């Protein structure tokens, strides 16, 4: 009783995380949730957590005098 009729219809696509869409190994969904729960702003855009992660990683790379972001910079 899926409600798609006899032909079957389209099945739902496999879930894809926002981290994989952004090409990051960092939890974009978790950062977004924390931005919303932390009362930083009334509304938080979909790209805000991705930008925040990359901005902080870029700052860490610059502090280490590197021009390329590596996974270690995401952790710092």
Swiss-Prot record:
SMART domains: H2A (SM00414). Core component of nucleosome. Nucleosomes wrap and compact DNA into chromatin, limiting DNA accessibility to the cellular machineries which require DNA as a template. Histones thereby play a central role in transcription regulation, DNA repair, DNA replication and chromosomal stability. DNA accessibility is regulated via a complex set of post-translational modifications of histones, also called histone code, and nucleosome remodeling. Acipensins are antimicrobial peptides. Acipensins 1 and 2 have antibacterial activity against Gram-positive bacteria L.monocytogenes EGD (MIC are 1.1 uM and 1.0 uM, respectively) and S.aureus ATCC 33591 (MIC are 0.9 uM and 0.6 uM, respectively), against Gram-negative bacterium E.coli ML-35p (MIC are 0.7 uM and 0.3 uM, respectively) and antifungal activity against C.albicans 820 (MIC are 1.0 uM and 0.9 uM, respectively). Acipensin 6 has antibacterial activity against Gram-negative bacterium E.coli ML-35p (MIC=2.5 uM). Antimicrobial activity is reduced by high ionic strength. Belongs to the histone H2A family. Residues 1-23 are annotated as: Disordered. The modification N6-(2-hydroxyisobutyryl)lysine is found at residues 6, 10, 37, 65-66. Disulfide bonds: none annotated. Coiled coil: none annotated. The modification Phosphoserine is found at residue 2. GO terms for cellular component: nucleosome; nucleus. The modification N6-succinyllysine is found at residue 10. GO terms for biological process: defense response to bacterium; defense response to fungus; immune system process; killing of cells of another organism. Keywords: Acetylation, Antibiotic, Antimicrobial, Chromosome, Fungicide, Hydroxylation, Immunity, Isopeptide bond, Nucleus, Phosphoprotein, Ubl conjugation. There is a cross-link at residues 14, 16 (Glycyl lysine isopeptide (Lys-Gly) (interchain with G-Cter in ubiquitin)). Residues 7-19 have a biased composition (Basic residues). It comes from the Eukaryota. The nucleosome is a histone octamer containing two molecules each of H2A, H2B, H3 and H4 assembled in one H3-H4 heterotetramer and two H2A-H2B heterodimers. The octamer wraps approximately 147 bp of DNA. Gene3D superfamilies: Histone, subunit A. This is Histone H2A. The modification N6-acetyllysine is found at residue 6. Phosphorylation on Ser-2 is enhanced during mitosis. Phosphorylation on Ser-2 directly represses transcription. It comes from Acipenser gueldenstaedtii (Russian sturgeon).
């Amino acid at each position: 009783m899926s409600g798609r009729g006899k032909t079957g219809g389209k099945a739902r696509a496999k879930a894809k995380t926002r981290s994989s869409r952004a090409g990051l190994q960092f939890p974009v969904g978790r950062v977004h949730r924390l931005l919303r729960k932390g009362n930083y702003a009334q509304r938080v855009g979909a790209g805000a957590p991705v930008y925040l992660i990359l901005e902080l990683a870029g700052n860490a790379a610059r502090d280490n005098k590197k021009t390329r972001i590596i996974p270690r910079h995401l952790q710092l």
